[in-house]
A protein has these predicted regions:
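N-terminal alpha-helical transmembrane segments of multi-pass membrane transport
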Residues: 5-11, 21-26, 30-56, 64-67
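Glycine-rich phosphate/diphosphate-binding loop of Rossmann-like nucleotide-binding domains
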Residues: 10-28, 159-163, 169-250
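Short acidic, glycine/serine/threonine-rich loops at helix termini
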Residues: 25-27, 85-89, 143-147, 219-224, ...
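N-terminal glycine-rich phosphate/adenylate-binding segment common to multiple enzyme folds
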Residues: 50-166, 273-277
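Glycine-rich phosphate-binding loop
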Residues: 67-80, 238-307
Length: 326
């Protein structure tokens, strides 16, 4: 029998290894499903927690820069350490999330799509095609500032401009004790998010929906709406028409109602918190939270394919952390 001709590769992809059980499964996937059939070329980076600690997390930055160079990366699940992990692994410090570091360098948007297979039936009967969630991965409640406010205090929003002038806005006069929260976002980040969404819609030939609550949040959410519309009108409207797809904006509550009634088959762009919640809801309603793809896409066309889940910690007992897996 003639030897199988492997699929050739010209440009290497960036391989980001992970932690614990993912290292075992990723090696099995390569050995059984990839290496016998593909002349695999990769630039390898070990993002295991021990190596991140050994390199003072430089390896994470280096892997992201390599991804910008080659354009494609595959990333395994990694540990974002908490206090218990710092003690367990004897870490120098509580290192940041590798995903957050990579997303910041690549300026990317996370697209998550349910995997539809026979035998797993969506809980919503009308859903026939996948619904892709595009989640803005910067700002909002995830980079907020919070404070407890005592009774009798007054909370104000103060903006100090470059020329030293100040702008104040009253948040609330607290007759009783309460809480406050400050959030922010950046025009540049919203613009990158919008372009990544529009480009992904063109690449996949799917309609793009975007939803906020601009009727209530007339500055914050409205800014998202305005930036999306400006970029669509100026850069993408003609391309969308040629591709036979559409961009559609609506309020977030209306979007939820439309999503439940729809057949699927589109991209739903969400702000950070909305995307965090809705991606889990959509995946679970399709039948399985674990059955979901996740890809980080940059406006310049860089792709990083990652696990849409964390680590299978329960599959690694304490003895197997110290001994070889049999």
């Amino acid at each position: 029998m003639a030897e199988y001709q492997k699929i050739p590769m010209q440009t290497p992809l960036v391989e980001m290894d992970g932690d614990e059980m993912t290292r075992i499964l990723w090696k099995m996937i390569k050995d059984i499903l990839i290496l016998p059939y593909v002349d695999l070329k990769t630039e390898y980076y070990d993002l295991g927690l021990e190596n991140r600690d050994r390199t003072d997390d430089r390896v994470t930055v280096e892997s992201a820069m390599a991804t910008k160079k080659y354009g494609v990366a595959v990333k395994c699940a990694t540990i974002t350490p908490n206090a218990a992990r710092v003690e367990e692994y004897h870490l120098k410090e509580m290192w940041k999330s590798p995903n957050a570091t990579i997303r910041a360098i690549l300026d990317g948007t996370v697209f998550r799509t349910p995997i539809i297979v026979k035998g797993i039936t969506p809980f919503i009967p009308s859903w026939k095609k996948p619904i892709t969630i595009a989640r803005h991965a910067y700002g909002d409640v995830y980079k907020n500032t919070e404070a407890a406010v005592p009774a009798g205090a007054k909370a104000e929003l103060l903006i100090t401009k470059a020329d030293g002038s100040e702008e104040k806005h009253l948040i609330h006069d607290f007759k009783t004790s309460g809480i406050i929260q400050g959030m922010h976002n950046l025009d540049s980040s919203i613009e990158s998010f919008a372009r990544a969404c529009f480009n992904f819609a063109l690449d996949t030939k799917q309609d793009l929906w975007f939803a906020t609550k601009d009727t209530i949040s007339k500055k914050y959410d409205h800014r998202f709406k305005d930036i999306f519309q400006e970029i669509y009108d100026g850069e993408y409207q003609e391309k969308f028409q040629q591709a036979g797809i559409e961009y559609f904006y609506t309020l977030i509550d209306d979007a939820v109602a439309r999503v439940v009634r729809s057949e699927g088959g589109y991209i739903w762009a969400c702000k950070n918190y909305d995307g965090d919640v809705m991606s889990d809801m959509v995946a679970t309603a399709f039948g399985s939270l674990a059955m979901m793809t996740s890809v980080l896409v940059s406006p310049d066309g860089t792709y990083e394919y990652e696990a849409a889940h964390g680590l299978s910690l329960i599959h690694i007992s304490e003895p197997t952390r110290q001994e070889a897996i049999s």
